[in-house]
Amino acid sequence: MSTAALVEGKIVQCIGAVIDVEFPRESMPKIYDALILDGSELTLEVQQQLGDGVVRTICLGASDGLRRGLTVKNTAKPISVPVGKPTLGRIMDVLGRPIDEAGPIESEHTRSIHQKAPAFDELSPSTELLETGIKVIDLICPFAKGGKVGLFGGAGVGKTVNMMELINNIAKEHGGYSVFAGVGERTREGNDFYHEMKDSNVLDKVALVYGQMNEPPGNRLRVALTGLTMAEHFRDEGLDVLFFVDNIYRFTLAGTEVSALLGRMPSAVGYQPTLAEEMGKLQERITSTKKGSITSVQAVYVPADDLTDPSPATTFGHLDATVVLSRDIASLGIYPAVDPLDSTSRQIDPNVIGEEHYSITRRVQQTLQRYKELRDIIAILGMDELSPEDKLSVARARKIQRFLSQPFHVAEVFTGSPGKYVPLKETIRGFKMIVDGECDHLPEQAFYMVGTIDEAFEKAKKIS
């Protein structure tokens, strides 16, 4: 459509990021149509039709300098972003515009960020395991290829570091394409991630879409959809794509801000009344079809460490595996601080992961659960009051707890110890030896921050 044919309207009200625009009554824009401010790059997205030709829009960019009477043009279509191979190796904003100063993105294809979820008969569930090289995840909450994974945790327990390690272990080994959506996170982390990818020579396989903390709520609300649209295009071309989102909570938070600005009545804890619908629309699109797969890893901030908060609670139901990071475990110095009793996966089924893996996972969890039950008795009466069986359970549980820790590649610069990738077979063998009692003679310090069980034996020799 040529610019001359675009219907024009005038701004009639500005309240923060919400702009009301009046159009001729017979040519009101549709919901989700993109409007462009005349003589500027600023885009507005229609959210509500108020009647009498007035539409309420959300501003995708700073609303500084806007005033009543300015001319706005209706593009008569939703926000569309470039998709396909030209997006790889580039950093883009919510509108798909490059922000890495490396020239324009020459893409033949564009795609609307608002798409319908694939039809039920197009879906293709998978039970194939995706090895991560992180012991606690591979053992307790294994990932499925084409599945959805959530990393849940409060502030500062290691969500982003865990996600970076997963990207390091999976994206580098994967060989396919990845899309990273930075939703309302720190700009520094986005910058670090870009350089991390560049240094490891996988930048040409990753598309980066950022709507960071300092950006208006409209950008943070839509940037997850922009990244997802790019991932969907690769999937529909028959590829297996990895989709990383950091952080889904900020998507919800941006929705809360926008909802309040639009004048909707808040629901529980101040969240938007449409929380479940917005989350569902996003999550139902992150799925694998008969053409290709999207394997997604999403970091989910947990406000005040409360997993029953409406935002994380709404996210739980959409996931195949949940990795719960615990402040109590982090305070013991055990990293990754994954809670082996809270974390779950739908893959934990003997028909999927095999009888051996299943039984060892359950035995490890039973041992840790027993230790948890005995902790109060130990605190009051001491270890001496326990029965010999319970003493043995506690000793093994403490070894398991330490063996679940692991040095990360992405944390080498902070810790000084080289990162370890542990194959699934080695993980199962190591934990089998501990629960079978083959390591009862080793000191528990030998299991802390090692890779395989053989390294624990080596470390024990040095300690003794």
Curated annotation (Swiss-Prot):
It catalyses: ATP + H2O + 4 H(+)(in) = ADP + phosphate + 5 H(+)(out). GO terms for molecular function: ATP binding; ATP hydrolysis activity; proton-transporting ATP synthase activity, rotational mechanism. GO terms for cellular component: plasma membrane; proton-transporting ATP synthase complex. It is an enzyme of class 7 (translocase). It comes from the Bacteria. Pfam families: ATP-synt_ab, ATP-synt_ab_N, ATP-synt_VA_C. It is found in: Cell inner membrane. This is ATP synthase subunit beta. It comes from Burkholderia ambifaria (strain MC40-6). The gene is atpD.
